[in-house]
Design a protein with these regions (language model features):
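Hydrophobic alpha-helical transmembrane segments of polytopic
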Residues: 83, 87-90, 111, 170-177
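Aromatic-anchored segments of alpha-helical transmembrane domains
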Residues: 35-37, 112-120, 176-186
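Membrane-embedded catalytic cores of phosphoryl/pyrophosphoryl-handling enzymes
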Residues: 129-220
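Short hydrophobic alpha-helical membrane-anchoring segments
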Residues: 35-42, 115, 119, 123, ...
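Membrane-interface loops
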Residues: 48-50, 87, 92, 96-166
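N-terminal transmembrane-helix/juxtamembrane module of multi-pass inner/ER membrane proteins
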Residues: 2-80, 123-130
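Alpha-helical transmembrane segments of integral membrane proteins
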Residues: 24-27, 102-110, 169-174, 194-198
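Hydrophobic, membrane-inserted alpha-helices
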Residues: 12, 68-69, 86-93, 154, ...
Length: 220
């Protein structure tokens, strides 16, 4: 009887977001390749026409102040002003409530370090590619912040919530929020290439961060 119950538990499918270390590094490499590709399109001025076409497709000529204000409120959920304080709260929660000081510190440092990396990249673009007027916003700071923060949460959820239905609801809700904020950014005038570049940087940061943590500490 006990043997049968053990088999039933062991044959249960693992949650999609409960990824092994090698898969996390592989995904990080894929997102890195996508970022390099997008950077190449921006650098050689191939992305401008694509950005304009996507913006014109998603935004009509007439501006709606109420819509703009609503979209700015949505975008605020991915801004540094919202993400950084929230990451500190998550870090405190992981350190005290979950009694995992290393993970709490690691979570906060991951968000802060990639925020610093973004500022360095934007500084590089501003001084090196001034002749590309649309590259000033590449990559999008908000897109990177929201993808990194919510991506880390998505990867951590399966480790803390046992019920798979709740795991899926939370994980896909956060994915939907990432896409919603990205669409809001494009409608407000941020170029598609900048948003996509921020997505790729944030996603590779989340994958590499959790992958390195699991490599060092073996478990969460």
């Amino acid at each position: 009887m006990a043997e049968n119950s053990f088999k039933n538990v062991s044959t249960q499918p693992k949650p999609f977001f409960l990824l092994p270390v090698k898969t996390l590094f592989l995904l990080g490499g894929v997102f890195s390749a996508f970022f390099i590709l997008i950077f190449g399109l921006v650098f050689f001025d191939y992305a401008n026409s694509m950005d304009n076409a996507i913006f014109n497709l998603m935004r009509s000529n007439s501006s709606n102040p109420i819509l703009d204000q609503t979209l700015r409120c949505v975008v605020f959920l991915g801004s540094s002003q919202f993400v950084l304080p929230l990451s500190l709260l998550v870090g405190v929660f992981l350190s005290l409530y979950r009694r995992n000081l290393a993970l709490g510190v690691w979570f906060v440092l991951s968000v802060i370090l990639f925020e610093a990396l973004l500022k360095s990249l934007k500084h590089l673009f501003l001084h090196s590619f001034q002749w590309l007027s649309h590259s000033v916003n590449f990559p999008s700071a908000i897109a990177l912040s929201l993808t990194l923060f919510y991506g880390l949460l998505i990867l951590l959820i399966p480790h803390f919530i046992a019920h798979q239905i709740f795991q899926n609801i939370l994980s896909y809700s956060l994915l939907g929020l990432i896409l919603l904020i990205g669409l809001a950014l494009i409608v407000l005038g941020v170029s598609f290439s900048s948003v996509l570049g921020g997505f790729c940087l944030g996603a590779l940061g989340a994958c590499f961060s959790i992958g390195i943590y699991l490599s060092v500490f073996q478990k969460i």
